[in-house]
Swiss-Prot record:
This is Chaperone protein DnaJ 1. Homodimer. CXXCXGXG motif repeats lie at residues 137-144, 154-161, 174-181, 188-195. The gene is dnaJ1. It comes from Aquifex aeolicus (strain VF5). Its main location: cytoplasm.
Length: 364
């Protein structure tokens, strides 16, 4: 599941047509609230980073224009690349890393939904999944250049990799060389000099028995590639149970409908019923079972850590649609003997009451 496009205007609390002065004013106000030296709350540090993210995007005309285009199209893919760079230089600003070697940093986590059948989630399985992940470019092996690197000193920052600007004179990574201090003359044509590409990745994930809807499975170090030699991020899979053609899961129980014939409902007998394992079991139906009755089969429901729920069968009585003449006569004879008081059973060709009613309508 991809990173959503953040609304930096909302984060700073300004309108989308806000001037630079309005952006600076909103930024100063929020910094006084969330700066780590002022606010000791651990959550304030993350909020402070996000505020700086928003400010350093919106205060720069070129960067703001690029962001506005991404936001208007809700282009999650473009924003992922954009966010990676923004977070990198904001962190370097906050940490005061000017002129220092970049330290290894863990890659971004990946969060996505994992659709599972009831069988896969309930009984457990090894599930193969394919997803997109940032990896080293296979052509340049993560170097970002084609062949031997040909570089020139960045004219914008004179090789410093940083330029001082902004209301607090913060050193910011140079937007021309992306903070490197040099410009590669022969960037890799596959990754455009980034050293990494988004590639399809295939893994097998263990699904434990009794996995529930909404449960999140963590797969360590299967997220995006790390930065500067750092570890990859983690992969988080949120379980979504698919609709089942037979069973409906309610808590730990499985519910299903079973159609039985009228004679079996009256006389009793056994029917074949499927289980989650794909087997069939014999279930006894009591004589005189009515439509809508339920039959509970213990411990044949959804698995969980210490056992299993029940299988609850909702009985429906099937009504035959096409009867032969002999079958109809037998049923008519039976109906006469077991019908309730006040009932008039239609015979073939209509009942006496029906014929008299039709005659009166013709003479009216």
């Amino acid at each position: 599941m991809s990173q959503a496009v953040k609304d930096y205007y909302e984060i700073l609390g300004v309108n989308r047509d806000a001037t630079k002065e309005e952006i600076k004013k909103a930024y100063r106000k929020l910094v006084r609230i969330y700066h780590p030296d002022i606010n000791p709350d651990p959550s304030a540090q993350e909020k402070f980073k996000e505020i700086n993210e928003a400010y350093h995007v919106l205060i720069d005309d070129e960067r703001r224009s690029e962001y506005d285009a991404i936001l208007s199209r809700n282009d999650v893919g473009k924003f992922r690349d954009f966010l990676e760079y923004i977070q990198e230089f904001v962190e370097s600003i906050i940490q005061g890393e000017k002129g220092k070697k970049r330290r290894p940093r863990k890659g971004q986590d990946i969060k996505m939904k994992l659709p599972l059948t009831l069988e896969e989630a309930g009984l457990g399985c090894e599930k193969e999944i394919i997803y997109s992940r940032w990896m080293d470019c296979p052509v340049c092996e993560g170097m970002g250049v084609k062949g031997e690197a040909e570089t020139v000193v960045c004219h914008a920052c004179n090789g410093e990799g940083r330029r001082v600007s902004g209301i607090f004179n913060f050193p910011r990574p140079c937007s021309v060389c992306k903070g490197k201090g040099f410009i590669v003359k022969n960037p890799c044509p596959t990754c455009y000099g980034r050293g990494r590409v988004s590639a399809q990745h295939k893994i097998k994930v263990h699904i434990p028995p009794g996995t529930e809807e909404g449960e999140v499975l963590k797969v360590p170090e299967k997220g995006h590639l790390g930065y500067f030699g750092g570890k990859p991020g983690d992969l988080y899979l949120k379980v979504v149970l698919k609709e089942h053609p037979i069973f409906k899961k309610v808590g730990k129980d499985l519910h299903m409908e079973k159609v039985v014939s009228f004679p079996l409902a009256v006389l009793g007998g056994t029917v074949k019923v499927p289980t989650l394992e794909g087997e069939e079991i014999d279930v006894f139906i009591q004589p005189g079972t009515e439509c809508g009755a339920t039959k509970v089969v213990k411990e044949k429901g959804y698995p969980y850590e210490n056992g299993r729920g029940d299988l609850i069968i909702h009985i429906r009585i099937g009504v035959p649609k096409n009867l032969s003449k002999s079958e109809r006569k037998l049923l008519e004879k039976l109906a006469e003997s077991i019908k309730e008081e006040g009932e008039e059973v239609y015979r073939e060709g209509g009942s006496l009451v029906e014929k008299l009613s039709s005659l009166f309508k013709k003479n009216a």
